[in-house]
Amino acid sequence: MTLLVGLGNPTLRYAHTRHNAGFDILDSLVSELDLSFTFSPKHNAFLCVYKDFIFLKPQTYMNLSGESVLSAKNFYKTKELLIVHDDLDLPLGVVRFKNGGGNGGHNGLKSIDLLCSNSYYRLRVGISKGIGVIEHVLSKFHKNEEPLKNAAFEHAKNALKFFIESHDFNAMQNRFTLKKPLKIES
């Protein structure tokens, strides 16, 4: 089984903020597959099982995401872990993939690295840098950013659909990496 995790913060206060890119992309994927999440108190997360995948949205707040991930990983004895997360070091509209490595200062990844190791797949979605990191990642996208954000999230969702069918991270990486922001026609 593969554990596919979207990172974000719970509560309406953080809904659709830059830091919740992982939640939003997973929500879109689950909706398109005509599935739904159910809350698991055991893992303090919303879960959805599909084929040999477990979709997980930790409800621990970002800095403690590793607790939910470790709990689900151990309970389901998953072989692979893929984390979908925002990346402020990437421009908005860029989607990249990584296997292992550092956390880039992302607190959700720090928590996962500490409790689980740093050997997992990542789908990184650019949110661009702003003035004041905390304020920026916890802010909503500006109206003029919405078309590019929506296109990037759709691209990331399509990459995940490909991965679910292929079970091939390298093929997904080769096919769906966007080194430059998507071009949006107005």
From Swiss-Prot:
Substrates-to-products reaction catalysed: an N-acyl-L-alpha-aminoacyl-tRNA + H2O = an N-acyl-L-amino acid + a tRNA + H(+)
Acyltransferase among keywords: no
GO BP term (any one): protein quality control for misfolded or incompletely synthesized proteins
Key word Lipid metabolism present: no
Underlying gene: pth
GO cellular component annotations of the record: cytoplasm
Top-level taxon of origin: Bacteria
Subunit annotation: Monomer.
Database matches in Pfam families: Pept_tRNA_hydro
Listed SUPFAM superfamilies: Peptidyl-tRNA hydrolase-like
Enzyme class, broadest EC rank: hydrolase
Residues of the active site: H19 (proton acceptor)
Compartments where located: Cytoplasm
Enzyme Commission number, as recorded: 3.1.1.29
One function term, GO molecular function aspect: peptidyl-tRNA hydrolase activity
Annotated site (Discriminates between blocked and unblocked aminoacyl-tRNA): N9
Site entry: Stabilizes the basic form of H active site to accept a proton: D86
Job description of the protein: Hydrolyzes ribosome-free peptidyl-tRNAs (with 1 or more amino acids incorporated), which drop off the ribosome during protein synthesis, or as a result of ribosome stalling.
Family: Belongs to the PTH family.
Record-listed tRNA binding positions: Y14, Y61, N63, N107
Alphabetically ordered keywords of this record: Cytoplasm, Hydrolase, RNA-binding, tRNA-binding
Organism: Helicobacter pylori (strain ATCC 700392 / 26695) (Campylobacter pylori)
Identification of the protein by name: Peptidyl-tRNA hydrolase
